[in-house]
Amino acid sequence: MKYGNLMMTKKKLLIGMVTISGIVILGSCGKTETVNELLIVDQCNDVRDLCRLELANAQVSRYTNFLGKTIKRLQSQTPLRDIQGTVTWNASAGTSLADNSDVQSELGLSCQDDNCTANSNSTAYTLPVGSNTISVSGTVTVDGKTIDLATDVPALVINTSAAGSSVHVFPTELEGNLTLQDLVDSLNQGRHYAHATFSADGSNLKIQCDPGYVWLDDINPEYGGQSSAASARSVAMVSWVEELEEFRVDEFRFLHFDMSSLTLNGVRLGNHVFWEMGCWPT
């Protein structure tokens, strides 16, 4: 009996050693090579809505494992100077070439010849919230080799976050029998569409954005005014009907499902006063 147990133990150890040896052998069955590639290198601010872009000569190591998966690691990069040929930058809709003074003040850098253009290397773009694709095209000669940039240089995807905060306070100048608490209660009926909670902050109206949502810093309408953002989001919308001295929410509920770029803070249209508010996804 003891002999049988001993043989089983030896067999398990042998299987374990074979398995471990197999893993070591498979793990070593890979190939590593170092190559030079042209890449787009970006330097951006915190929310990535301003990015400087440069075409660089990069040294990249490629490791291909036994499963055929390739892992790339950037070893070094050198900006291309005195390019022979033409570089043309291509950016997705909504982007625009940046002002070099903004690049200097925010990033401490500059575009080529202090001018950010579609043909300079480096250049810079201002980017809208969301996913932005930057690519490069043209034909250049590097170290005697002619390169088709559109084919050989992979596009770069930059995800831009909304610049904002989780809380915003609106001034109010409510009149008649309209109370701040009534306004808060009415807006909170649509809080799930606004992705926020409304409350009173002294005599002002406060919006607290849900996690994953922000209020854009540059959207700050005075009472009776409105602001328009570059991007839309879902909103809560209510109106105060003066002759009835009551809020109406349901008749405007269809607007909750619309994507609106407007923010209304007590905008008067005839005998109605409107509020339209909602936070933006980060």
Swiss-Prot record:
Regions that span the bilayer: none
Expression induction: During infection of mouse bone marrow-derived macrophages (BMDM) expression decreases when the bacteria is expected to be in the phagosome. Disruption of genes for cas9 or either of its associated tracrRNA or scaRNA increases transcript levels about 100-fold both in culture and in mouse BMDM.
Lipid attachment points (N-palmitoyl cysteine): 29
Keyword line: Cell membrane, Lipoprotein, Membrane, Palmitate, Signal, Virulence
Topological category with respect to the lipid bilayer: Lipid-anchor
Lipid-attached positions, S-diacylglycerol cysteine: 29
Disruption phenotype: Significantly decreases interleukin-6 (Il6) production in a Tlr2-dependent fashion by C57BL/6 mouse BMDM.
GO cellular component: plasma membrane
Residues making up the signal peptide according to the UniProt record: 1-28
Coiled coil residues, start to end: none
Top-level taxon: Bacteria
InterPro entries assigned to the protein according to its UniProt record, in alphabetical order: DUF3281
Localization per record: Cell membrane
Disulfide bonds: none
Purpose of the protein: Stimulates the host immune inflammatory signaling system allowing the host to combat the bacteria. Stimulates mouse interleukin-6 (Il6) production.
Full protein name: Bacterial lipoprotein FTN_1103
Gene source species: Francisella tularensis subsp. novicida (strain U112)
